[in-house]
Amino acid sequence: NYLISVENELKEKKAIVDEQNRLYDKIDNLIKPEMDKVKGILKSISPEDKDFDKEMRLACLYIAYIKRRSNLAMIMENKLDISSNELVYAIKESLDYLSFYGIRSSFTYEGETSLDNKVGGLIFEFYQDCIIRSLSSIHSCLVKLECKPNKVVIKVILDEKITYFDLNYKKKEIEESNGIMKISIKVFLPPQVQFNTS
């Protein structure tokens, strides 16, 4: 009986470790592009470089995303739904670092609801993709988030066009996430260029 008890205990511990490793691998895959960017920045600069300050601020911007995206993934792992406030906190912190980087930023949000966890992650990834794709050209960024039961709208308003943005952005993921929530993601790009997925 003692041996069986020890064996069962070891199996339980192994299952916990396996689950933790699975989660870490999942998060690793989610944030790998940003981690690679940070590693690249840190390898390529030294304190004597004239762009050292700017590059370190850029690294901080990526690190803020890594922190918040990882946090969202951890919360989502344990819950089918998350509070839209988690998304608000994530975008707020990221925009603080965008301002620190030198781009004027503003964030307005309205309402509070429960989000299907896939929708929450998708919206934050979309926001991040907009910022990263436009980082070299924009001077200001306004993000508006509207949360209502069964509807979440994010608008990213930039002062320059994004060089390239797929109009079918993560269409498959958006369709798969639409079981519980209806989401509409929009980007307004002057002059009146619009990306809209409903």
Residue ranges and their predicted role:
Residues 126-132, 164-175:
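Short, non-transmembrane amphipathic alpha-helical segments
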